[in-house]
């Protein structure tokens, strides 16, 4: 890959020029096909993706696309493709997918990133994918997944077999053990943390905090009978 611009003015000029080029070609339906890309639009789009990511800053690409489209029309250059913005959005998403593959991000993480992608959050999405890819096969990743699976399997079974509704209304006043109290406190601490941070900026720390729940989650399930005969206690433990 060639170097991308780093100075603010150069970044702005590079991004707007590339998007303006793509808007013009997509606007007259001159788009790449599976076998042909005569105007190197795939390389142009990848240049936009790389410039955003390597400068470590989200940019409002959707707004730039809309503004560029309006300029063409205002200057009398009628764009005949009514699906221009959607098609260019999907094209850039596809280039982002390609970029993630080049960085050896796992397929399932790539697809999760693409499904929720906003063009205005490309760097944030990349960072999340990179951090998740890094942690998922580590011990911390194993801890996150095992904690989630153990809880979700019990919940799914109870909700399916006993038609119990979960309303997130845990009553700590009827806890019978410290294991319940410890899990309740851990959940409250995590909720408090997530309510006071920017998840996009603290993604790695957020994952590590989730991994840290394994001990208290497993102690709860190893020592507390969730499927209690007393319906009130059973529902409260499921709520927890």
Across the structure, where does each feature detected by a protein language model lie?
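Amphipathic alpha-helical "coupling" segments that flank catalytic cores
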Residues: 1-240
